[in-house]
């Protein structure tokens, strides 16, 4: 791979991108959600394990199902967002490794020997995929509002009962209302966050 993105693209993905709390009344099509996933799925994960599982909450009924799990500060903005993505991770992701990692038919055994190790792997790589999700959304012209203020057990019971999937975080997506943004917060400098050794 060669070449690099220009400043306009980098602004869209990072420098000008914000966490949105207010939303315009503009729908997000199912086709756009499919396109979003079809971008994010190419991001790297350990042994291509791809543990992320996503539920796109769009309907009024589904939003009402989600509402009891939300913290007070996240309720209004989530109800107003065109889509709320429940980003989950499958703790038994390894069952799909014969399909996803055909280079080595024993790859499933790298993870299924320990529930703790499998869940750590699923959470770590599912979190990576959650970041890819937001970058893919921004690249398609959508804004994001990731959240961790919710009751995990309530979300799991309402949306993942009877499965091996657990919620990681929630992410509202749509077209953000810039008038609802806070002033941008600072970030750590390179010197504060990094070392070259």
Swiss-Prot record:
UniProt-listed Enzyme Commission number(s): 1.-.-.-
Classification via InterPro entries: Nitroreductase, Nitroreductase-like, Nitroreductase_HadB/RutE, RutE-like
Gene3D superfamilies the UniProt entry points to: NADH Oxidase
Keywords: Flavoprotein, FMN, NAD, NADP, Oxidoreductase
GO-annotated molecular function: oxidoreductase activity
SUPFAM superfamilies listed in its UniProt record: FMN-dependent nitroreductase-like
CDD domains, sorted: RutE-like
Cofactor: FMN
Family per similarity comment: Belongs to the nitroreductase family. HadB/RutE subfamily.
Annotated PANTHER family: MALONIC SEMIALDEHYDE REDUCTASE RUTE-RELATED
Cited NCBIfam families: PRK05365.1
Name of protein: Putative NADH dehydrogenase/NAD(P)H nitroreductase Plav_3612
């Amino acid at each position: 791979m060669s070449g690099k993105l220009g400043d306009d693209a980098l602004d869209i993905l990072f420098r000008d991108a914000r966490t949105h709390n207010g939303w315009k009344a503009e729908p997000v099509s199912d086709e756009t959600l499919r396109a979003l996933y079809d971008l994010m799925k190419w991001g790297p994960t350990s042994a291509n394990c791809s543990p992320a599982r996503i539920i796109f909450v769009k309907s009024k009924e589904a939003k009402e199902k989600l509402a009891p799990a939300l913290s007070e500060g996240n309720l209004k903005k989530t109800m107003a967002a065109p889509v709320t993505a429940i980003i989950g991770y499958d703790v038994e992701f390894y069952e799909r490794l014969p399909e996803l990692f055909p280079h080595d038919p024993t790859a499933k055994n790298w993870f299924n020997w320990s529930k703790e190790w499998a869940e750590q792997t699923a959470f770590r790589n599912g979190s990576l995929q959650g970041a890819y999700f937001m970058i893919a959304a921004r690249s398609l012209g959508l804004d994001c509002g990731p959240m961790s203020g919710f009751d995990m057990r309530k979300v799991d019971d309402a949306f993942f009962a009877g499965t091996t999937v657990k919620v990681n975080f929630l992410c509202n997506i749509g077209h953000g209302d810039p008038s609802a943004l806070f002033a941008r917060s600072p970030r750590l400098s390179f010197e504060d966050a990094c070392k070259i050794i």
